[in-house]
């Protein structure tokens, strides 16, 4: 299977190089990708000592349209790592991919964005404030090495498939298991989106169970209002038999003006975790967003009851 992935990737790359060498009416064009997530936060009560400025994450890259439906993109992810102290930053290559759009098909190869929760993250819309549910609670990875394909049947139905290493973009492939995923998206009318996704991650050997993921989502987005909900389930987490998680997330926003909107979100994860966030977003010009927000988190996964209350001023800069 790995050989097939690399062969398909090589064919796609060669095709792209050949297409870019040919004369075309499509003029190549590119754009820089820069996104910076930062915040100031302070705790209340027993978290009163937790305060400070934080550079949460930075994305730097470039996207180039070659013409004939081909596009290449490379993105670096600069953020914190669990393997080093908080005062350190570490850089990863998050995307190094080639995309080909032809007819109703979209094909991706390389270090690509995954499809497990991409729709939910875009609908949530405040990634610089908080990760989407599956990303936050480690139900899956946002990018991985492999290939994906999507086909649009008509205006209201599309489907996609993906095959990747299954270990994310921060780890190299050290094991033999792969991850497979199938998804379908329905848009019965403008503004309403429904999606279902199923994924399976193989165990490295007979001692490890296959991980299974089910992700469902429904969301309504209007010009001034949006409301979405998702339910997610994971069987055999960490390749451990019987270690199952599930949970849901509900979120919405309302526009007060072209520059200001308010948002709410509630998460409930079966791993004894709940979270609530409420905030206001202010668009300061074209490239900057500011969002004062309040967060409540509850976590008694270790048998100890504990609530935390935090105030944030989240900041986004990007183009």
Residue ranges of model-derived segments:
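Cleavable N-terminal export/targeting peptides
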Residues: 1-26
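Outer membrane beta-barrel
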Residues: 23-166, 176-178, 185-192
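Detector for outer-membrane/organellar transmembrane beta-barrel domains
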Residues: 27, 175, 182-271
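Transmembrane beta-strands of outer-membrane beta-barrel pores
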Residues: 38-44, 57-59, 76-82, 102, ...
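Hydrophobic, lipid-facing positions within transmembrane beta-strands of outer-membrane proteins
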Residues: 56-60, 93-96, 105, 143-147, ...
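Repeated loop/turn-to-beta-strand initiation elements of outer-membrane beta-barrel proteins
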Residues: 68-72, 104-107, 155-159, 190-196, ...
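Outer-membrane beta-barrel "beta-signal"
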Residues: 184-186, 282-284, 307-319
């Amino acid at each position: 299977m790995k050989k097939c992935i690399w062969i398909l990737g090589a064919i796609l790359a060669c095709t792209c190089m050949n297409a870019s060498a040919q004369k075309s009416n499509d003029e190549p064009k590119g754009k820089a990708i820069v996104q910076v997530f930062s915040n100031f936060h302070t705790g209340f009560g027993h978290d009163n000592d937790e305060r400070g400025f934080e550079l949460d994450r930075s994305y730097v890259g470039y996207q180039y349209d070659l013409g004939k439906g081909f596009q290449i993109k490379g993105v670096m992810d600069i953020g914190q790592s669990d393997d080093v102290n908080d005062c350190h930053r570490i850089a990863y290559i998050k995307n190094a991919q080639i995309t080909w759009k032809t007819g109703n098909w979209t094909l991706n190869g390389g270090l690509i964005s995954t499809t497990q929760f991409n729709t939910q993250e875009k609908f949530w819309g405040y990634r610089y404030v908080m990760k989407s549910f599956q990303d936050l609670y480690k139900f899956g990875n946002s990018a991985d090495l492999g290939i994906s394909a999507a086909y649009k049947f008509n205006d209201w139905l599309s489907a996609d498939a993906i095959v990747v290493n299954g270990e994310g973009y921060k780890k190299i492939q050290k094991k033999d298991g792969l991850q497979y995923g199938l998804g379908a998206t329905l848009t019965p009318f403008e503004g309403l989106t429904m999606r279902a996704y199923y994924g399976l991650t193989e165990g490295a050997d007979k001692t490890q169970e296959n991980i299974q993921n089910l992700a469902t989502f429904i969301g309504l987005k209007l010009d001034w209002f949006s409301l979405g909900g998702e339910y997610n389930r994971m069987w055999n987490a960490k390749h451990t038999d019987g270690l199952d998680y599930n949970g849901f997330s509900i979120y919405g926003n309302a526009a007060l003006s072209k520059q200001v909107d308010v948002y709410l979100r509630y998460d409930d994860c079966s791993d004894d975790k709940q979270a609530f966030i409420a905030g206001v977003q202010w668009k300061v010009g074209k490239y900057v967003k500011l969002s004062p927000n309040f967060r409540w988190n509850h976590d008694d996964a270790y048998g100890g009851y504990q609530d935390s209350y935090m105030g944030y001023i989240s900041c986004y800069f990007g183009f």
